[in-house]
Amino acid sequence: MSLRIRLARGGAKKRPFYRIVVADSRSPRDGRFIEKLGTFDPMLPRDHERRVVLKDERVKYWLGVGALPSDRVARFLGLSGLTEARKVPEQTKQAQPKAKAQERLREAEEKARAAAEAAASAEG
């Protein structure tokens, strides 16, 4: 049985509320789960203390047994200090600005440099 620590959605329409649960990876998202480990309320502000609530000892136990956290839960665990924060991959070549955009950026930098040099020479 492959275990996952993941979010199970609750709450009303347009008012999400999530339970952080340990469940078999084959069970439905909001279906049967083994244990409730905490809650996540995305409607609260990011810095609110009740936005993510976790049972630390139980999370450590399930991680020790081999349960894998989902991406979102792994982020919560990293922020709470229970696991190492996942590393964000560097920008890929495909995500970088295209050639024309890079050329425009270079031209803008050169103009800014020239203006700064002109201002410096005018003062001195």
UniProtKB/Swiss-Prot annotation:
GO biological process: translation
Family matches, as Pfam families: Ribosomal_S16
Gene Ontology molecular function, alphabetical: structural constituent of ribosome
Compositionally biased intervals (Low complexity): 115-124
Gene Ontology CC: one annotated term: cytoplasm
Protein name: Small ribosomal subunit protein bS16
Database matches in NCBIfam families: S16 (TIGR00002)
Location of the region described as Disordered in the Swiss-Prot/TrEMBL record: 88-124
InterPro entries in the record: Ribosomal_bS16 (IPR000307), Ribosomal_bS16_CS (IPR020592), Ribosomal_bS16_dom_sf (IPR023803)
Biased amino acid composition, Basic and acidic residues: 100-114
